Design a protein with these regions (language model features):
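Histidine-centered, transition-metal-coordinating active-site segments
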Residues: 1-83, 97, 101-279, 287, ...
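Short alpha-helical catalytic segment bearing the HExxH-like zincin motif
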Residues: 84-92
Length: 420
């Protein structure tokens, strides 16, 4: 599925220019992007650890900093409101390495919001950020919760800046399903509409473009429903838990190290314990160059400031917690499997625990049912509060079928990978 589309080169600067043309770029944004508390996110991938396993063939590395910047540009483009834009920029400030993998390891695969808990504390505790906010006449309370701004964030299946930005680069990187031309067409068709609750929401001017976007979005969301994705995130989450228990990594490390640094530490820890030669290791290292994010002096000042709590209540059919005498062997086995796996098995039952790592999980469904301007209405500007809008599924049989197919889809009960 991930090789359906031919490889293509993507220019992320061109993508950002679609989101917000340079002549409309928010003049205050760059100074915030330079903050250590945000620069840390350059070392955190958007795609939840899939950059580090050959099971995926990600076309390029896209960081949480890139995503945060993209969300801010979208919010600014549609609102020109400084507080909302900065709130969008800061919304992922508490994201640990490997992004939503930390939700999986904390038992939150279904909602994937556990990592948001420290956001307000981090924002209020950063002196440099506080100084910039004061210069711009803003307070922490105005930017610490982007959920209060419906253009920035709302609930599925509505469309928001966060959801919009997340799925554009996900589709480009995971399977190449978005072209720049399609992104430009969809994005330039958007406007602000009023939803059923009378709240602002991004929506489409034309039915045809709304259908195109819905189809692409649900196709990418389908990738995230597959057992391949569930297993990858859960396996990496178990590796993180074992590394923390072994004293190799700490909760603070997950908030301060880059993904590359975590991988290098795991490489060093497990390299003498490999039961098989990592034939793909060289290829993975070359791929990892795309993921590298050097820790600058400004990022260094951010280290050791924040920690997180954990709990492990995710339903996982995998090996029982290893005894101390074998924990290193199990960690090495899991890690080498993660770094070399190229396929998994889809099964109705869990396979033997001593040979396989298996998952049986329900995860967050990412789909969209956007607003679209009613066919008897007209809209010519980005402010369409008086224009009648409807949900796409109410007027499009095609979209209704796509959405229902997505919601009813279920992979096999178990996804399993043979352990090395």
């Amino acid at each position: 599925m991930l090789s359906r589309y031919a490889p293509a080169d993507y220019d992320i600067s061109e993508y950002f220019n679609i989101l917000c043309p340079r002549d409309d770029w928010p003049p205050f944004l760059d100074k915030y992007l330079k903050l250590p508390v945000l620069q840390r996110l350059a070392g955190v991938g958007l795609l939840c650890g899939t950059d580090w396993t050959p099971l995926y063939k990600n076309r390029f590395y896209y960081s949480r900093l890139d995503h945060s910047k993209g969300v801010a540009l979208i919010v600014w483009h549609f609102t020109h409101d400084k507080a909302q834009t900065i709130a969008g920029l800061l919304h992922d400030i508490s994201t640990p390495v490997f992004s939503h993998v930390s939700d999986f390891r904390k038992g939150d695969a279904l909602t994937q919001t556990a990592t948001e808990e420290p956001t307000a504390r981090i924002i209020r505790g950063d002196a440099e950020l506080g100084r910039l906010l004061a210069e711009d006449g803003l307070t922490a309370s105005q930017v610490e919760d982007y959920h209060i701004y419906p253009i920035a964030d709302n609930e599925i299946p509505q469309l928001s800046a966060d959801r919009l930005e997340y799925m554009f680069p996900s589709g480009m990187a995971l399977d190449g399903s978005w072209t720049m031309e399609e992104i430009c067409r969809c994005y330039n068709d958007l406007t602000i509409l009023k939803n059923e609750e009378g709240r602002d929401e991004l929506g489409f001017r034309s039915l045809e473009v709304a259908e195109l976007y819905c189809e692409h979005f649900c196709m990418i969301g389908h990738i995230l429903q597959l057992n391949e994705n569930k297993l990858t995130l859960q396996l990496l989450g178990q590796i993180m838990n074992m590394a923390e228990k072994a004293g190799l990594l700490s909760e603070s490390d997950f908030m301060t190290l880059s993904e590359r640094e975590v991988i290098e530490r795991l490489d060093d820890y497990t390299k003498h314990d490999s039961h098989t030669k990592l034939d793909r290791h060289g290829e993975l290292d070359r791929h990892a160059e795309l993921v590298s994010a050097s820790i600058t002096s400004s990022e260094q000042r951010f280290r050791n400031k924040f920690g997180m709590t954990t709990s492990n209540d995710v339903e996982c059919h995998c090996e029982a917690e290893p005894k101390q005498s074998t924990s290193r062997d199990i960690l090495s086995r899991y890690y080498h499997t993660f770094r070399t796996m190229t396929k998994i098995e889809h099964t109705n039952e869990a396979l033997p625990e001593n040979e396989y790592f298996c998952v049986n999980l329900k995860v967050k469904q990412r789909y969209i049912n956007p607003l679209v301007v009613a066919q008897n209405s007209a809209v010519v500007s980005t402010d369409s509060t008086n224009v009648k809008s409807v949900r796409l599924s109410d007027i499009s049989e095609k979209a209704r079928s796509i959405i229902e197919d997505f919601k009813s889809y279920s992979d096999t009960p178990y996804g399993c990978v043979k352990l090395l």
